[in-house]
Amino acid sequence: MAPKKDVKKPAAAAPAPAPAPAPAPAKPKEEKIDLSAIKIEFSKEQQEEFKEAFLLFDRTGECKITLSQVGDVLRALGTNPTNAEVKKVLGNPSNEEMNAKKIEFEQFLPMMQAISNNKDQGGYEDFVEGLRVFDKEGNGTVMGAELRHVLATLGEKMKEEEVEALLAGQEDSNGCINYEAFVKHIMSV
């Protein structure tokens, strides 16, 4: 018998390299609002009223306000933008820029127009419906303590002083708040 040939077994194939991790999903780019492309549709009288309100927030006499004041002026003029909407119309500035950078009325006006053009703002029925969720007994009231908690901890959180100022005089002797009357009150302020 012939001696067996020394047959070498093929070397075991190296394990396949692990697949490269999938790239992290790209964050959707925030659409920037091109304020220069916004057509001002306000009447001259409205613009004068807006300028008067704008100047009430000018603390230095320069006819300018800080970026952090823009939301306050917008709300004082009857719009109801979220803080996120305000930051978006401002171009998403840093917190440092919010307090340091100033704008003139001519820069503010397109921002006011952009916010006014946004038809996605809640109205009376939307707010009542949102509060109805907390009406455990279905009697048109919510507990003041629960509403305080919600306003201070959910969504755009309010400071405790802001919550107290908002709810002042709204609670009945049982600590309940008629939420339809409350919504009418806050929408008229």
UniProtKB/Swiss-Prot annotation:
* Molecular function in Gene Ontology: calcium ion binding; structural constituent of muscle
Record flagged with keyword Acetylation:
yes
Q: Which CDD domains does the entry mention?
A: EFh
User: What are the GO BP annotations of this UniProt entry?
Assistant: cardiac muscle contraction; muscle contraction
Origin species, per record, is Rattus norvegicus (Rat)
Task: Give start-end positions of Pro residues composition bias.
Answer: 16-26
Q: What is this protein called?
A: Myosin light chain 1/3, skeletal muscle isoform
- N,N,N-trimethylalanine modification, residue list: A2
Listed SUPFAM superfamilies: EF-hand
Q: Does the keyword Lipid metabolism apply?
A: no
Its annotated function is as follows:
Non-regulatory myosin light chain required for proper formation and/or maintenance of myofibers, and thus appropriate muscle function.
Q: Name one GO cellular component term.
A: contractile muscle fiber
Q: Which residues form the EF-hand domain?
A: 45-80, 122-157, 157-189
Organism placement in taxonomy: Eukaryota, Metazoa, Chordata, Craniata, Vertebrata
Task: Please provide the record's keywords in A-Z order.
Answer: Acetylation, Methylation, Motor protein, Muscle protein, Myosin, Phosphoprotein, Repeat
Disordered: where is this region? Answer: 1-30
The gene is Myl1
Note the InterPro entries from the entry.
CALM/Myosin/TropC-like, EF-hand-dom_pair, EF_hand_dom
Q: Which residues carry this modification: Phosphothreonine?
A: T66, T82
Subunit annotation:
Myosin is a hexamer of 2 heavy chains and 4 light chains. Does not bind calcium.
**Residue list for modification Phosphoserine:** S68, S94
**After translation, how is this protein modified?**
Isoform MLC3 is acetylated at position 2.
